[in-house]
Amino acid sequence: MKTNNLGYPRIGSNRELKKASELYWAGKISADELLDAGKEIRLKNWYLQSEAGVDLIPSNDFSFYDQVLDLTLAVGAIPQRYHELAKSNSSLDLYFAMARGSQKNGQDVVAMEMTKWFDTNYHYIVPEFTKNQKFELFSEKILNEFKEANAVGIKTKPVLIGPVSYLLLGKEKEEGFNRIDLIDALLPVYFEILEKLQIENAEYIQLDEPFLALNLTDKERNVFTKVYNEINVRFPKLKIVLANYFDCFGENLETALALPVDTFHLDLVRCQLQLDDILESGKLASNVNLSLGVVDGRNIWKNDFKKSLELIKKAADALGENRILLAPSCSLIHSPCDLDLETNDQTLTPEIKQWLAFAKQKINEVVLLKQFASGEVNPKNSADYERNVIANENRKTSKLIHNNEVKARTAGITAADDKRKSAFASRRKSQIKALNLPLFPTTTIGSFPQTTEVRSWRAKFKKGELTTEQYNDLIEKETEAAIRFQEETGIDVLVHGEFERNDMVEYFGEQLDGFTFTKNGWVQSYGSRCVKPPVIYGDVSRPNPMTVKWSKYAQSLTSKWVKGMLTGPVTILQWSFVRNDQPRSETCTQIALAVRDEVVDLEKAGIKIIQIDEPAIREGLPLRKEEWAKYLDWAVKAFRISASGVNDDTQIHPHMCYSEFNDIIQNIADMDADVITIECSRSQMELLDAFANFKYPNEIGPGVYDIHSPRVPSSKEMVRLLEKASAVIPVDQLWVNPDCGLKTRHWNETKKALIEMVAAAQEMRKAVENPVTE
């Protein structure tokens, strides 16, 4: 029996990668210094896993931005718009330009599209493919990192995304072909990579093929068969670990089991039943091993050793111990680094802390499970086992978790609780009369730049270095400055800027019962952006208003409307580490009731427009389409519960991003929002087609510029996007806004971009009022 790890967090236990990357982008450190910071993180990760006793330690799981972008560079799939830039820049700067866009030395290129990695809160950079796409080995990162580990005496298992999933992760940038047909052009580059690794004596290679958990066409399944047979013919001595995670193989199981690989990795956290399916199928070849993903790589709860050992015993009895590998369910990039860094009992109480395990602890759990399953019992690990059993039993019975009032309120929800008082057509008349907004009303999506100064105020306040009065005074001044800037710029519906908020989920979690927090529980969201998800450990309720004070203050400063800003129940759920002792739908409904109470209180305080951010509704979709309807039913209902306690003339704005809407457009309509704002600019308004084809009746604010890039777009660019939008959506339904909140941007670029955005809206109004006649 061996231990296997699929990937380890690359941000560094103290977010060293974030700090180094941002210093490099700001021109404050050299490329060599950034590369050294990356190397130091890799070495620490390898040593940690080696010392813990991991047999198959991954390499190439490190990335300066994103593992999919790494592979795009490795196989030379560099979009045409970066070719000129590639001539005059290092491959590192080319890489970051592809991720972030670039406006340097007279060059102006937009970033590649970014979207969610399956149903996680990680984002990847979407590969772009053309009909005659050429591939060539461009970067040897995979080989270099394998050699780097070898140089310090650590034999690793290189990890790369498998060729079929890589193509399926991408997007066709022109019509007339299917990206899966590029497989014959792509495979030779994979062969070249595998050849180089074989020459360097690599024994195991992990190929991640998570699309095997999705609904595939017969053609796509046939491509899997072709690819892995070819790899086996060319590299019969390489031990290929084929990793599937996040769900079952489903109808792809027969195809998968026929592939000539050394080991199949199974996610037994998300899909425990597949172990029985495989063992009972009789189709697992006698020379093929199973990697059992029994430790949850995506959540932070301590493993239940008793349950895991039952699964391991079942597999070992059927196949023999020598054919079993033990592993986390997926890469640990979705877990925080180290629970040992949580030393503040006020932030995370000892009772809750004993229920948790982060990446370092999960590695130890995998190693301990191997020892127990192999009969390697000693006094130390016996004590570890006993502690695990006690912690899990304690969690089941803890009074911290259960609130009977919350359970009763949730059970008492009626059909009327998730419906507005009137239909949209009637509400719209009330809102037009009450709000009196122009055509193409302009707004932003909530947050404004959080400067180092603003963040330092919050840190000082938390440390007790600022009094509540001093802190509030500073936030008031910053809020007033934001209101005045928006008024001067000519924005129609203002926001208060969210300067008091650390994170759009954490801020609410800090004020809700049933949530707790970590001090250092950071995980990578994209690039250098890390998030510290709250921990939902028990029943959720709202003891006090959460946002009313600041929204009310901002509204008192201006005669224009100020939006209330809330995070929706599904997003709070999706972006938290969620308790695993009850259905997610039940936890979501509890959160929805808490948000509903806040919406009602905002309305009472005179706030007539309330944004409820739900960027995560689509990412919560199960990977398999046959399970979508059940999820969408409770997710949409939770949103409606949160939004339906107000009068007709109060306008509800959900904000959604990273979304393809075609296949869930009916469910979006079922949310019954007054105005939906969506991320649109990177896709050049393609996303609007779904709304147009559906004849979506409500109002829409398609994002007109990409806030994930520092690039400042011109008003002409935004006018072009608005013209595209107005070609498919009636002009009296269109709003004008950025893609997303502006928290991570700098004030300089934000001000310039919003001035351009308002100019674009004004130009569109003129065009409608004075149409050009042929």
Swiss-Prot record:
Annotated L-methionine binding lies at: I445, G446, S447, E498, D613
Which ranges form a coiled coil?
none
- List its EC numbers: 2.1.1.14
State where L-homocysteine binds: I445, G446, S447, E498, D613
Q: Which Gene Ontology MF annotations are present?
A: 5-methyltetrahydropteroyltriglutamate-homocysteine S-methyltransferase activity; zinc ion binding
Note accompanying the cofactor annotation: Binds 1 zinc ion per subunit.
Q: Hey, what's the signal peptide range on this chain?
A: none
Residues that hold Zn(2+) according to the record: H655, C657, E679, C740
Q: Does the keyword Flavoprotein apply?
A: no
Q: Which reaction does it catalyse?
A: 5-methyltetrahydropteroyltri-L-glutamate + L-homocysteine = tetrahydropteroyltri-L-glutamate + L-methionine
Q: Please list the residues that make up the active site.
A: H708 (proton donor)
Any idea which positions bind 5-methyltetrahydropteroyltri-L-glutamate? R15, E16, L17, K18, K116, R529, C530, W575, E619
Name the source's superkingdom.
Answer: Bacteria
CDD domains for the chain: CIMS_C_terminal_like, CIMS_N_terminal_like
| Main EC class the enzyme belongs to | transferase
Question: What InterPro entries does the annotation carry?
Answer: Cbl-indep_Met_Synth_N, Cobalamin-indep_Met_synthase, Met_Synth_C/arc, UROD/MetE-like_sf
Q: Which PANTHER family match?
A: 5-METHYLTETRAHYDROPTEROYLTRIGLUTAMATE--HOMOCYSTEINE METHYLTRANSFERASE
Protein's recorded name: 5-methyltetrahydropteroyltriglutamate--homocysteine methyltransferase
